[in-house]
Amino acid sequence: MSIDLDHKLSVLAAAEEAPDAVAVRSNGDCLTYGVLAEKVRDILPQLGDARPYPLIARPDLDTLIKVFALLERKQPILLLHPGLTEHERNTLLASIEGLDHHFPGNTAVILFTSGTTGLPKPAILTREALAASAEASRDNIPLSPGDVWLLSISPARIGGFSILTRSLIARSAIALGPKFSPKEYLRRLEVDRVTYSSIVPTMLRMIFDEAPEWRPSKNLKALLVGGAPTSEKLKAEAEDKGIPVILTYGMTETASNVVTTPFAERYRRTCGSGKINKGVQIKSEDGHLFIKGPMLMHGYWGRKPLVPGAWFDSGDIGEVDSDGSVCVPP
Protein backbone atom coordinates (compact mmCIF):
# COMPACT_ATOMS: atom_id res chain seq x y z
CA MET A 1 0.00 0.00 0.00
CA SER A 2 1.52 3.31 -1.04
CA ILE A 3 1.80 6.20 1.38
CA ASP A 4 0.38 8.42 -1.37
CA LEU A 5 -2.80 6.33 -1.61
CA ASP A 6 -3.28 6.33 2.16
CA HIS A 7 -2.88 10.12 2.07
CA LYS A 8 -5.47 10.51 -0.68
CA LEU A 9 -8.07 8.46 1.20
CA SER A 10 -7.49 10.23 4.53
CA VAL A 11 -9.88 12.91 5.74
CA LEU A 12 -7.35 13.74 8.47
CA ALA A 13 -4.72 14.44 5.82
CA ALA A 14 -7.25 16.56 3.91
CA ALA A 15 -7.87 18.58 7.07
CA GLU A 16 -4.14 19.18 7.51
CA GLU A 17 -3.89 20.43 3.93
CA ALA A 18 -6.92 22.72 3.99
CA PRO A 19 -8.71 22.84 7.37
CA ASP A 20 -10.99 25.70 6.29
CA ALA A 21 -12.00 24.22 2.94
CA VAL A 22 -15.65 23.17 2.68
CA ALA A 23 -16.09 19.40 2.90
CA VAL A 24 -19.86 19.08 3.33
CA ARG A 25 -22.83 21.22 2.34
CA SER A 26 -26.38 20.57 3.47
CA ASN A 27 -29.31 22.85 2.75
CA GLY A 28 -27.12 25.94 2.88
CA ASP A 29 -25.04 24.92 5.91
CA CYS A 30 -21.33 24.11 5.58
CA LEU A 31 -18.85 21.85 7.35
CA THR A 32 -15.13 22.34 6.83
CA TYR A 33 -12.56 19.58 6.46
CA GLY A 34 -11.17 20.61 9.86
CA VAL A 35 -14.51 20.12 11.60
CA LEU A 36 -15.24 16.91 9.68
CA ALA A 37 -11.87 15.49 10.71
CA GLU A 38 -12.65 16.20 14.37
CA LYS A 39 -15.94 14.33 14.06
CA VAL A 40 -14.08 11.41 12.49
CA ARG A 41 -11.51 11.41 15.31
CA ASP A 42 -14.31 11.39 17.89
CA ILE A 43 -15.95 8.31 16.41
CA LEU A 44 -12.83 6.22 15.75
CA PRO A 45 -12.74 4.63 19.26
CA GLN A 46 -16.43 3.67 19.00
CA LEU A 47 -16.26 1.63 15.81
CA GLY A 48 -15.13 -1.72 17.17
CA ASP A 49 -13.16 -4.30 15.23
CA ALA A 50 -15.80 -5.93 12.99
CA ARG A 51 -14.31 -6.96 9.64
CA PRO A 52 -16.23 -6.13 7.60
CA TYR A 53 -18.09 -3.38 9.43
CA PRO A 54 -21.81 -3.55 8.46
CA LEU A 55 -23.22 -0.12 7.67
CA ILE A 56 -26.69 0.86 6.49
CA ALA A 57 -25.56 3.60 4.14
CA ARG A 58 -27.83 6.62 3.96
CA PRO A 59 -27.01 9.91 2.20
CA ASP A 60 -26.50 11.66 5.54
CA LEU A 61 -23.71 13.07 7.70
CA ASP A 62 -23.60 10.11 10.08
CA THR A 63 -22.89 7.71 7.21
CA LEU A 64 -20.31 10.08 5.76
CA ILE A 65 -18.43 10.31 9.06
CA LYS A 66 -18.44 6.53 9.57
CA VAL A 67 -17.26 5.81 6.02
CA PHE A 68 -14.37 8.26 6.31
CA ALA A 69 -13.48 6.91 9.77
CA LEU A 70 -13.43 3.32 8.49
CA LEU A 71 -11.31 4.34 5.51
CA GLU A 72 -8.96 6.03 7.97
CA ARG A 73 -8.65 2.78 9.93
CA LYS A 74 -8.38 0.69 6.76
CA GLN A 75 -11.28 -1.35 8.13
CA PRO A 76 -13.36 -3.06 5.40
CA ILE A 77 -16.93 -1.78 5.15
CA LEU A 78 -19.98 -3.89 4.27
CA LEU A 79 -22.57 -1.52 2.82
CA LEU A 80 -26.29 -2.26 3.12
CA HIS A 81 -28.97 -0.31 1.27
CA PRO A 82 -31.39 1.61 3.55
CA GLY A 83 -34.30 0.71 1.27
CA LEU A 84 -34.06 -2.99 2.07
CA THR A 85 -36.74 -4.52 4.24
CA GLU A 86 -35.60 -6.35 7.36
CA HIS A 87 -36.28 -9.65 5.59
CA GLU A 88 -34.23 -8.62 2.55
CA ARG A 89 -31.37 -7.42 4.74
CA ASN A 90 -31.38 -10.64 6.76
CA THR A 91 -31.41 -12.68 3.55
CA LEU A 92 -28.30 -10.88 2.31
CA LEU A 93 -26.52 -11.26 5.62
CA ALA A 94 -27.43 -14.95 5.73
CA SER A 95 -25.90 -15.39 2.26
CA ILE A 96 -22.48 -14.31 3.58
CA GLU A 97 -22.67 -16.01 6.96
CA GLY A 98 -19.84 -18.47 7.35
CA LEU A 99 -17.71 -17.02 4.55
CA ASP A 100 -13.98 -16.58 5.12
CA HIS A 101 -13.32 -13.14 6.65
CA HIS A 102 -9.66 -13.03 5.64
CA PHE A 103 -9.86 -10.27 3.04
CA PRO A 104 -6.97 -8.80 1.12
CA GLY A 105 -5.23 -6.26 3.34
CA ASN A 106 -6.15 -3.45 0.95
CA THR A 107 -9.90 -4.17 0.96
CA ALA A 108 -11.86 -0.93 1.30
CA VAL A 109 -15.49 -1.86 0.84
CA ILE A 110 -17.86 -4.69 -0.01
CA LEU A 111 -20.93 -3.68 -1.99
CA PHE A 112 -23.77 -5.90 -3.06
CA THR A 113 -24.50 -5.83 -6.77
CA SER A 114 -27.90 -4.61 -7.93
CA GLY A 115 -29.15 -8.18 -8.14
CA THR A 116 -31.03 -7.86 -11.43
CA THR A 117 -30.63 -11.62 -11.83
CA GLY A 118 -30.68 -13.72 -8.69
CA LEU A 119 -29.40 -12.81 -5.23
CA PRO A 120 -27.08 -9.77 -5.15
CA LYS A 121 -23.40 -10.72 -5.04
CA PRO A 122 -20.92 -9.14 -2.58
CA ALA A 123 -18.17 -7.47 -4.62
CA ILE A 124 -14.85 -6.72 -2.92
CA LEU A 125 -13.33 -3.38 -3.93
CA THR A 126 -9.80 -2.46 -2.90
CA ARG A 127 -8.43 0.95 -2.07
CA GLU A 128 -6.43 0.82 -5.29
CA ALA A 129 -9.56 0.13 -7.35
CA LEU A 130 -11.40 3.09 -5.82
CA ALA A 131 -8.44 5.40 -6.42
CA ALA A 132 -8.01 4.17 -10.01
CA SER A 133 -11.70 4.78 -10.67
CA ALA A 134 -11.52 8.28 -9.19
CA GLU A 135 -8.45 9.14 -11.24
CA ALA A 136 -10.01 7.84 -14.47
CA SER A 137 -13.14 9.89 -13.78
CA ARG A 138 -11.14 13.01 -12.96
CA ASP A 139 -9.18 12.69 -16.19
CA ASN A 140 -12.42 13.46 -18.05
CA ILE A 141 -14.48 15.29 -15.44
CA PRO A 142 -12.45 18.03 -13.71
CA LEU A 143 -13.04 17.82 -9.96
CA SER A 144 -11.10 20.08 -7.61
CA PRO A 145 -11.41 22.00 -4.32
CA GLY A 146 -14.39 24.32 -4.57
CA ASP A 147 -16.52 21.84 -6.49
CA VAL A 148 -19.65 20.39 -4.87
CA TRP A 149 -21.08 16.96 -5.75
CA LEU A 150 -24.67 16.33 -4.68
CA LEU A 151 -25.17 12.94 -3.02
CA SER A 152 -28.67 12.25 -4.29
CA ILE A 153 -28.37 8.44 -4.42
CA SER A 154 -27.54 6.00 -1.65
CA PRO A 155 -23.84 5.41 -0.95
CA ALA A 156 -24.77 1.73 -0.64
CA ARG A 157 -24.63 1.73 -4.44
CA ILE A 158 -21.34 2.29 -6.21
CA GLY A 159 -22.72 5.37 -7.97
CA GLY A 160 -23.21 6.99 -4.57
CA PHE A 161 -20.18 5.57 -2.77
CA SER A 162 -17.85 6.72 -5.53
CA ILE A 163 -18.99 10.30 -4.93
CA LEU A 164 -17.55 10.03 -1.41
CA THR A 165 -14.18 8.70 -2.52
CA ARG A 166 -13.85 10.97 -5.57
CA SER A 167 -14.62 14.02 -3.46
CA LEU A 168 -12.25 13.01 -0.68
CA ILE A 169 -9.39 12.37 -3.11
CA ALA A 170 -10.04 15.70 -4.90
CA ARG A 171 -10.53 17.56 -1.58
CA SER A 172 -13.83 18.88 -2.93
CA ALA A 173 -17.20 19.05 -1.17
CA ILE A 174 -20.18 16.71 -0.90
CA ALA A 175 -23.72 18.07 -0.70
CA LEU A 176 -26.09 15.88 1.30
CA GLY A 177 -29.43 15.51 -0.40
CA PRO A 178 -32.81 14.54 1.09
CA LYS A 179 -35.04 11.78 -0.24
CA PHE A 180 -35.44 12.52 -3.93
CA SER A 181 -38.27 14.66 -5.22
CA PRO A 182 -37.80 16.87 -8.30
CA LYS A 183 -38.76 20.08 -6.52
CA GLU A 184 -36.45 19.59 -3.54
CA TYR A 185 -33.64 18.23 -5.71
CA LEU A 186 -33.66 21.33 -7.92
CA ARG A 187 -33.81 23.58 -4.86
CA ARG A 188 -30.74 21.87 -3.36
CA LEU A 189 -28.83 22.30 -6.62
CA GLU A 190 -29.17 26.05 -6.13
CA VAL A 191 -28.90 26.37 -2.35
CA ASP A 192 -25.77 24.22 -2.08
CA ARG A 193 -24.15 25.64 -5.25
CA VAL A 194 -23.83 22.17 -6.72
CA THR A 195 -21.38 21.76 -9.60
CA TYR A 196 -21.89 18.01 -10.18
CA SER A 197 -24.71 15.58 -9.55
CA SER A 198 -25.34 11.92 -10.36
CA ILE A 199 -28.83 10.61 -11.11
CA VAL A 200 -30.51 7.77 -12.97
CA PRO A 201 -32.64 8.26 -16.11
CA THR A 202 -35.95 7.84 -14.25
CA MET A 203 -35.00 10.75 -11.96
CA LEU A 204 -34.23 12.96 -14.96
CA ARG A 205 -37.55 11.97 -16.51
CA MET A 206 -39.36 12.99 -13.30
CA ILE A 207 -37.57 16.35 -13.29
CA PHE A 208 -38.58 17.08 -16.87
CA ASP A 209 -42.19 16.03 -16.21
CA GLU A 210 -42.64 17.99 -12.99
CA ALA A 211 -40.45 21.01 -13.77
CA PRO A 212 -40.55 21.43 -17.57
CA GLU A 213 -39.34 25.04 -17.35
CA TRP A 214 -36.22 24.20 -15.35
CA ARG A 215 -32.90 25.28 -16.80
CA PRO A 216 -29.56 24.72 -15.05
CA SER A 217 -27.68 27.54 -13.35
CA LYS A 218 -24.12 28.42 -14.31
CA ASN A 219 -22.89 26.58 -11.20
CA LEU A 220 -23.85 23.18 -12.63
CA LYS A 221 -20.92 21.90 -14.67
CA ALA A 222 -22.37 18.46 -15.42
CA LEU A 223 -25.22 16.13 -14.62
CA LEU A 224 -24.08 12.50 -14.71
CA VAL A 225 -26.81 10.11 -15.82
CA GLY A 226 -26.30 6.37 -15.51
CA GLY A 227 -27.41 3.18 -13.81
CA ALA A 228 -29.48 2.31 -16.88
CA PRO A 229 -29.44 3.23 -20.58
CA THR A 230 -30.78 6.71 -21.38
CA SER A 231 -33.38 6.93 -24.14
CA GLU A 232 -32.79 9.04 -27.24
CA LYS A 233 -35.89 11.07 -26.33
CA LEU A 234 -34.44 11.95 -22.93
CA LYS A 235 -31.09 12.87 -24.50
CA ALA A 236 -32.85 15.16 -26.98
CA GLU A 237 -34.84 16.90 -24.25
CA ALA A 238 -31.68 17.50 -22.23
CA GLU A 239 -29.94 18.99 -25.26
CA ASP A 240 -32.91 21.25 -26.04
CA LYS A 241 -32.92 22.54 -22.45
CA GLY A 242 -29.17 23.23 -22.45
CA ILE A 243 -28.44 20.72 -19.70
CA PRO A 244 -24.82 19.52 -19.50
CA VAL A 245 -25.37 15.75 -19.43
CA ILE A 246 -22.61 13.18 -19.12
CA LEU A 247 -23.86 9.69 -19.83
CA THR A 248 -22.13 6.92 -17.91
CA TYR A 249 -21.79 3.16 -18.07
CA GLY A 250 -20.30 1.07 -15.31
CA MET A 251 -21.13 -1.30 -12.50
CA THR A 252 -20.27 -2.27 -8.96
CA GLU A 253 -17.59 -4.65 -10.23
CA THR A 254 -15.74 -1.79 -11.97
CA ALA A 255 -15.89 0.62 -8.99
CA SER A 256 -18.28 2.94 -10.89
CA ASN A 257 -18.24 4.16 -14.49
CA VAL A 258 -15.77 3.01 -17.12
CA VAL A 259 -17.49 4.80 -20.02
CA THR A 260 -18.50 8.48 -20.02
CA THR A 261 -19.46 11.26 -22.39
CA PRO A 262 -16.39 13.45 -23.02
CA PHE A 263 -16.67 16.55 -20.82
CA ALA A 264 -16.38 18.88 -23.82
CA GLU A 265 -19.41 17.21 -25.43
CA ARG A 266 -21.75 17.38 -22.43
CA TYR A 267 -24.06 19.96 -24.04
CA ARG A 268 -24.48 17.88 -27.19
CA ARG A 269 -26.54 14.76 -27.71
CA THR A 270 -24.18 11.86 -28.36
CA CYS A 271 -24.74 8.38 -29.68
CA GLY A 272 -24.26 5.39 -27.42
CA SER A 273 -23.15 5.51 -23.80
CA GLY A 274 -19.95 7.55 -24.14
CA LYS A 275 -16.27 6.79 -24.62
CA ILE A 276 -13.94 4.48 -22.72
CA ASN A 277 -12.30 6.13 -19.71
CA LYS A 278 -8.54 6.52 -19.57
CA GLY A 279 -6.82 3.45 -18.14
CA VAL A 280 -9.70 1.14 -19.08
CA GLN A 281 -9.84 -1.43 -21.86
CA ILE A 282 -13.16 -2.66 -23.24
CA LYS A 283 -13.78 -5.10 -26.05
CA SER A 284 -16.87 -6.69 -27.55
CA GLU A 285 -16.89 -10.39 -28.35
CA ASP A 286 -20.00 -11.82 -29.97
CA GLY A 287 -21.85 -8.72 -28.81
CA HIS A 288 -20.82 -9.06 -25.15
CA LEU A 289 -18.67 -6.50 -23.33
CA PHE A 290 -15.44 -7.49 -21.58
CA ILE A 291 -13.55 -5.05 -19.34
CA LYS A 292 -9.97 -4.80 -18.10
CA GLY A 293 -8.35 -2.23 -15.83
CA PRO A 294 -7.04 -1.37 -12.34
CA MET A 295 -10.50 -0.35 -11.14
CA LEU A 296 -11.86 -3.91 -11.35
CA MET A 297 -13.00 -5.57 -8.14
CA HIS A 298 -10.81 -8.13 -6.36
CA GLY A 299 -13.64 -10.63 -6.81
CA TYR A 300 -16.89 -11.74 -5.21
CA TRP A 301 -16.68 -12.59 -1.52
CA GLY A 302 -16.70 -16.35 -1.11
CA ARG A 303 -15.54 -17.05 -4.67
CA LYS A 304 -12.19 -17.26 -6.38
CA PRO A 305 -10.65 -13.82 -6.96
CA LEU A 306 -10.31 -12.41 -10.46
CA VAL A 307 -7.05 -13.15 -12.21
CA PRO A 308 -5.02 -9.90 -12.24
CA GLY A 309 -4.88 -8.42 -15.73
CA ALA A 310 -7.56 -10.75 -17.10
CA TRP A 311 -10.68 -9.68 -18.97
CA PHE A 312 -13.87 -9.44 -16.90
CA ASP A 313 -17.15 -10.50 -18.51
CA SER A 314 -19.56 -7.67 -17.76
CA GLY A 315 -22.61 -9.73 -18.64
CA ASP A 316 -23.85 -6.81 -20.73
CA ILE A 317 -24.58 -6.69 -24.42
CA GLY A 318 -22.85 -3.88 -26.29
CA GLU A 319 -20.57 -2.73 -29.09
CA VAL A 320 -17.28 -0.84 -29.16
CA ASP A 321 -16.43 1.46 -32.08
CA SER A 322 -12.92 2.12 -33.38
CA ASP A 323 -12.90 5.59 -31.75
CA GLY A 324 -13.56 4.13 -28.29
CA SER A 325 -17.28 4.82 -28.24
CA VAL A 326 -19.38 2.21 -26.45
CA CYS A 327 -23.04 1.51 -27.09
CA VAL A 328 -25.08 -0.42 -24.54
CA PRO A 329 -28.63 -0.85 -25.88
CA PRO A 330 -31.72 -0.24 -23.70
Which residues make up each language-model segment?
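Conserved AMP-binding A3 loop
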Residues: T32-Y33, A108-E135
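Conserved ATP-binding/catalytic segment of the ANL
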Residues: H288-P330
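Conserved pre-ATP/AMP-binding loop-to-beta segment of ANL
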Residues: S2-K8, P19-D20, G98-F112, L119, ...
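Gly/Ser/Thr-rich phosphate-binding loop
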Residues: T195-I199, F208-Y267, Q281
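Conserved AMP-binding/adenylation subdomain of ANL enzymes
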Residues: A132-V148, A156-Y196, E210
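Conserved AMP-binding/adenylate-forming core of the ANL superfamily
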Residues: S2-I3, H7, D20-G48, E86-L93, ...
